[in-house]
Curated annotation (Swiss-Prot):
Gene Ontology molecular-function annotations: dioxygenase activity
Protein name (record): 2-heptyl-3-hydroxy-4(1H)-quinolone dioxygenase
Cysteine disulfide partners in this protein: none
Site features described as Increases basicity of active site His, chain residue numbers: D121
Native species: Mycobacteroides abscessus (strain ATCC 19977 / DSM 44196 / CCUG 20993 / CIP 104536 / JCM 13569 / NCTC 13031 / TMC 1543 / L948) (Mycobacterium abscessus)
Substitution effect: A96S: Increases substrate affinity
Top-rank taxon: Bacteria
UniProt keyword list: Dioxygenase, Oxidoreductase
EC number: 1.13.11.-
Taxonomic lineage: Bacteria, Bacillati, Actinomycetota, Actinomycetes, Mycobacteriales
Catalytic activity field: 2-heptyl-3-hydroxy-4(1H)-quinolone + O2 = N-octanoylanthranilate + CO + H(+)
Amino acid sequence: MITTKTVNGVQIAFDDQGHEPGPVFVTLSGWAHDLRAYDGMLPYLRAAQRTVRVCWRGHGPDRNLVGDFGIDEMAADTIGLLDALEVDSFVPIAHAHGGWAALEIADRLGAQRVPAVMILDLIMTPAPREFVAALHGIQDPERWKEGRDGLVQSWLAGTTNQAVLDHVRYDSGGHGFDMWARAGRVIDEAYRTWGSPMRRMEALAEPCAIRHVFSHPKIGEYDALHDDFAARHPWFSYRRLGGETHFPGIELPQQVAAEAIDLLAGARI
């Protein structure tokens, strides 16, 4: 059952499952998605550790407008919710640009409380020109739907995976121009501020174990970027999967859950 708590004056929707001791898995979606993005992974995660799935403000069952917010508020809301739930240490599992908030959370709390972070398919380079154009497009009230639809098609990459198609068709609605425009602005600001997620990781006051799990883009240069970063930073690792889409947690839930469990095991050593 999805429940809510009032945190920082807004309703934050979540569910809380599993009772295994130790660090809690905390799932965080990308923009304009909610906790259902982790339905496939949930049985594997909660069997290993207590698992709290969090919806960003305005992303729960109540889709009324909530006013402006960004990464600072996303991080503060998540920390406030976990404090209210008496969660001590935890491992964020964040999809796509939810990863910016996960890194902010890790930076604020330190490695003792956040021993690891797993990010699913976030663009690790500086934002490509065509992606920046798409971010600007979804901020234009005259063409935001066209921009949104173009992004979705790029995420799907022609897949026939039914779980991914069902998620996009049935579980990701309810957001209009207000939320999509905000997503474009906040993501654009993150890349302009930090340059890339890897540079954001390097700025952490106390680095924790971080793993990036993804299936695309399927180009050797992207793997080389990850190899170079991992060679310079022993706390970083990555796993390329054989999926087709931007949604590895939906497309390959058992494999992605296994990566989270392995990451946590390594962080405990």
